């Protein structure tokens, strides 16, 4: 028997098919609450190895991910699903397309500024004190 732990605040259901299972069909976490938890540079954990790798490949640190999260809007929700961290812990996550934040970035290789779209998947921990990011990469 496989033992796993649900670490997210949402836990009305549990994953049964090894992850990727869709949940609810509406956001589980309020964007204003996510922003409040991460305000001031606190309350964020890059929860998976993939997320740490995503941030590193973007040349981002903790504060850059928080800045992206602080720019999220309610209308950017895509879906909700179960995700694991590869160490028997599961989180019910909301996926958001952070394109409406209108992040314009300078791309030195082409000497041009462009609007860049990002995808972020996140959850709030059981205590309601931490936003855990599962994915954070360009769309």
Where are these regions (language model features)?
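Generic secondary-structure microfeatures
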Residues: 73, 103, 124-126
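Enriched for short, Lys/Arg-rich terminal
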Residues: 110-139
């Amino acid at each position: 028997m496989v033992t796993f732990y649900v670490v997210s605040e949402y836990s009305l259901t549990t994953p049964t098919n090894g992850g990727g299972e869709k949940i609810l069909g509406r956001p589980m976490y309020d964007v204003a609450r996510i922003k409040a938890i991460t305000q001031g540079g606190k309350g964020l954990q890059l929860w998976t190895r993939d997320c740490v790798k995503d941030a590193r490949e973007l040349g981002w640190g903790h504060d850059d991910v928080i800045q992206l999260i602080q720019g999220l809007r309610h209308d950017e929700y895509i879906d909700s699903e179960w995700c694991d961290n590869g160490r028997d812990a599961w989180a019910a996550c909301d996926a958001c397309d952070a394109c409406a934040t209108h992040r314009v970035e300078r791309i030195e290789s082409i000497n041009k500024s462009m609007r860049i779209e990002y995808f972020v998947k996140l959850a709030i921990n059981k205590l309601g004190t931490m936003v855990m990011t599962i994915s954070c990469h360009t769309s």
